[in-house]
Amino acid sequence: MAEAASISQGIAERYATALFELSKETGALKTLETDIDALKDVLAGSPDLGAMIASPVISRGDQAKAVAAIAGKMGLSPLMTNTLALMSEKRRLFALPQVLSALAGLIAEEKGEVTAEVTAATKLSAAQAKKLAETLKAKVGKTVKLNTTVDESLIGGLIVKLGSTMIDTSVKSKLASLQNAMKEVG
């Protein structure tokens, strides 16, 4: 299983690098970034699309038609549309989520940005998100893009993952620490 994951990651990185370099050469990085965000949203919102791109049962032709229709409807750039067509022709659409993630990473690196995965007990307000991004920027010296999710089981506080660093200030983890300390004493 790990081998299959590394193979699809390798495929994704090759497609992402090629698409990134072509977009960079043609000055279309902003368009590429817009396409990536749109595709991520569509994949997240449509389990059927995720199933279609991962299905080995659906023929290349049917996948190509579906991808062309979706790309046309979404107004994706010709470069992204052609890449999706090539991926469907080569039966590589299953790697699309990894391609999008790799592309987002390449673009962020190009822009000098880092992404922080933030899990909060409640939805962050715009002011809170801005303050957190500014604080993290001061810490790492780069522009920080927040990728936020809500997990009510945290009770309160945040979990911030930035690169290999994780900061857990959630009430849930504090209670777990307290529980462990009480077990040791009692």
From Swiss-Prot:
Keyword Ion transport belongs to the record: yes
Keywords: ATP synthesis, Cell inner membrane, Cell membrane, CF(1), Hydrogen ion transport, Ion transport, Membrane, Transport
Topology of the protein relative to the lipid bilayer: Peripheral membrane protein
UniProt xrefs under PROSITE patterns: ATPASE_DELTA
Chief localization: membrane
Top-level taxon of the source organism: Bacteria
Molecular function, one GO term: proton-transporting ATP synthase activity, rotational mechanism
Gene Ontology, cellular component aspect: plasma membrane; proton-transporting ATP synthase complex
Subcellular location: Cell inner membrane
Family from the record: Belongs to the ATPase delta chain family.
Subunit-level organization: F-type ATPases have 2 components, F(1) - the catalytic core - and F(0) - the membrane proton channel. F(1) has five subunits: alpha(3), beta(3), gamma(1), delta(1), epsilon(1). F(0) has three main subunits: a(1), b(2) and c(10-14). The alpha and beta chains form an alternating ring which encloses part of the gamma chain. F(1) is attached to F(0) by a central stalk formed by the gamma and epsilon chains, while a peripheral stalk is formed by the delta and b chains.
Function: F(1)F(0) ATP synthase produces ATP from ADP in the presence of a proton or sodium gradient. F-type ATPases consist of two structural domains, F(1) containing the extramembraneous catalytic core and F(0) containing the membrane proton channel, linked together by a central stalk and a peripheral stalk. During catalysis, ATP synthesis in the catalytic domain of F(1) is coupled via a rotary mechanism of the central stalk subunits to proton translocation. This protein is part of the stalk that links CF(0) to CF(1). It either transmits conformational changes from CF(0) to CF(1) or is implicated in proton conduction.
Protein name: ATP synthase subunit delta
Phylogenetic classification of the source organism: Bacteria, Pseudomonadati, Pseudomonadota, Alphaproteobacteria, Rhodobacterales
